[in-house]
Amino acid sequence: MEKLTVLILVATVLLTIQVLGQSDRDKHLKRRPKQYATKRLSARMRGHRQCTGAGYECEETPECCPNLTCKCSGSPLCTRYSCQA
């Protein structure tokens, strides 16, 4: 009888853990579309962003126009960065 009680208790705990894990996963999936919608709205509110063209100085890659990256140009000490293909 004691073994049966322990077995039922263990089964209940395992089932509870499974149900809680499933509900957390569902909440995460529901939250994801809202995050993307927030990012899209934020981008629209900022408007069209001017990008830095090839050969012009930059500080980081996101400011460069598409297909360009902010790379060191010139001396081995890397004192000047510019947008390059």
Curated annotation (Swiss-Prot):
Query: Does the record's keyword annotation contain Secreted?
Result: yes
Q: Which UniProt keywords apply?
A: Disulfide bond, Pyrrolidone carboxylic acid, Secreted, Signal, Toxin
Tell me what organism the protein belongs to: Conus miles
Q: Does the keyword Secreted apply?
A: yes
Propeptide feature: residues: 24-49
Q: How is it modified after translation?
A: Contains 4 disulfide bonds.
User: Family, per the entry?
Assistant: Belongs to the conotoxin O2 superfamily.
Q: What is this protein called?
A: Conotoxin Mi15a
According to the lineage, what is the superkingdom?
Answer: Eukaryota
Signal peptide residues are 1-23
Q: In which tissues is it expressed?
A: Expressed by the venom duct.
GO cellular-component term (any): extracellular region
Q: Which residues carry this modification: Pyrrolidone carboxylic acid?
A: Q50
